[in-house]
Regions:
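Acidic, glycine-rich A-domain
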Residues: 1-251
Length: 251
């Protein structure tokens, strides 16, 4: 936990861009001069804030389907480590899980933004049911509308094998219902990822699954993808993706 915290904090120190904030001394701000005689507000200068707040939030979305049953304790522990590290760096983080049960896709918020000490609830994570990844991503996008920053990074833990017992209903282009698995599931998930990115959300994934599903992961997430071989590598892989985001914001 300490090593991950230091890595993220050091990356922020290297790439941070100080914000200009109102002050009683510094560089005169012509747009604020009127405030002194009118409002008796003498903060008409700008100074550099050497400790700016991170300009983005992080959402960690955990696949909570039955395929993760064998490693659910490790997933919870890794989510806890990541959330604690981000909180120590002042980055707002939300940790959620998703699964599909009896035709419903359930998004469960384990730890919300600004919930101090809420990291312990991540250990309530459990695995059950199916994984309709596309619908889960759409729901996550809706939740991001209330996020406390302008920029967002959504990281999904995935096996790149969307699978649900309920079929895809007919559409104008495809008049017959289809099973939600294989290429149909991959295409649906990729469509939702593209929609989120068009809306300004950065979407990345930590992939742990069968080698046969690597092409699926590449098709859905492109270059914003980190592959792990063991679930205890989840926090470190997500940390690398977050450091990439910090560098992107600084460019």
């Amino acid at each position: 936990l300490l090593r991950l915290t230091e890595q993220i904090r050091n990356c922020m120190l290297v790439h941070r861009q100080p914000d200009a904030v109102p002050a009683r001394q510094g560089q005169l701000d012509g747009a604020r001069v009127w405030r002194e005689p009118v409002l008796r507000d003498d903060r008409v200068f700008l100074r550099s804030d050497e400790d700016p707040k991170p300009a983005f939030t992080v959402d960690l979305l955990l696949d909570g389907s039955a395929s993760r049953l064998h490693c659910q304790e490790t997933i919870a522990a890794q989510g806890y480590i990541l959330a604690k590290s981000l909180a120590a760096c002042g980055i707002d983080v939300r940790v959620s899980s998703f699964c599909s049960l009896r035709g419903y896709t359930v998004l469960r918020i384990l730890k919300d933004y600004g919930h101090r000490g809420g990291e312990r609830r991540i250990f309530d994570y459990f695995a059950a049911g199916w994984n309709r990844d596309g619908l889960a991503l759409r729901g996550a996008g809706q939740l991001l509308r209330a996020a406390p920053a302008d920029k967002h990074l959504l990281i999904l833990l995935t096996d790149a094998s969307p699978d649900d017992s309920h079929k895809i209903p007919p559409t104008g282009k495809i008049p017959l219902s289809r099973e939600y698995d294989g290429q149909a599931g991959v295409s649906d998930t990729a469509d939702e990822v593209r929609a989120l990115r068009r809306g300004g959300t950065r979407v990345a994934a930590v992939f742990m699954g069968e080698s046969a599903n690597v092409p699926n992961a590449n098709a859905i997430y492109g270059r914003d993808l980190a592959r792990i071989r063991r679930m205890d590598q989840l926090a470190a892989a997500a940390g690398r993706l977050i450091q990439d985001e910090i560098r992107e914001l600084a460019d």
